[in-house]
Amino acid sequence: MARISGVEIPNNKRVVVSLTYIYGIGLPTAQSVLKTLNISEDIRVKDLTEEQIKNISIEISKYKTEGELRREVSLNIKRLMEIGSYRGLRHRKGLPVRGQSSKTNARTVKGPRKTVANKKK
């Protein structure tokens, strides 16, 4: 397995798919990286030369990936919570942030139901 930007990428997959294993690199970014380096998307990682792998890692280092990107996202969320914006309050309460309804559903964000026992009549 080749190691690019601190991530072991799978050998037996196509290069364009393997690059998406890096946090912050999606399919369009992977395609543009390979296009600038004139590397075919259909080549498997195991067929890449050491020089090509080095060039890919240099090109990817120009992007924010992995820990740096995760840190930036968490700091952005923390900033929203500190300034007391609506989005920050939703993050703090553990509710959907982007305007989704939360009367029913929204279980992924809210977590499992907290059932309350019925009172006897």
Swiss-Prot record:
A Pfam family annotated for this UniProt entry: Ribosomal_S13
Biased amino acid composition, Basic residues: 110-121
Top-rank taxon, per record: Bacteria
InterPro entries: Rbsml_uS13_C, Ribosomal_uS13, Ribosomal_uS13-like_H2TH, Ribosomal_uS13_bac-type, Ribosomal_uS13_CS
Entry GO terms, CC: cytosol; small ribosomal subunit
Gene Ontology molecular function: rRNA binding; structural constituent of ribosome; tRNA binding
Record-level GO BP terms: translation
Keywords, comma-separated and alphabetical: Ribonucleoprotein, Ribosomal protein, RNA-binding, rRNA-binding, tRNA-binding
Listed Gene3D superfamilies: 1.10.8.50, 30s ribosomal protein s13, domain 2 (4.10.910.10)
Region called Disordered, residue ranges: 92-121
Subunit and interaction comment: Part of the 30S ribosomal subunit. Forms a loose heterodimer with protein S19. Forms two bridges to the 50S subunit in the 70S ribosome.
NCBIfam families: uS13_bact
Family in the record: Belongs to the universal ribosomal protein uS13 family.
Protein name, entry field: Small ribosomal subunit protein uS13
Organism: Mycoplasma capricolum subsp. capricolum (strain California kid / ATCC 27343 / NCTC 10154)
Lineage: Bacteria, Bacillati, Mycoplasmatota, Mollicutes, Mycoplasmataceae
Gene: rpsM
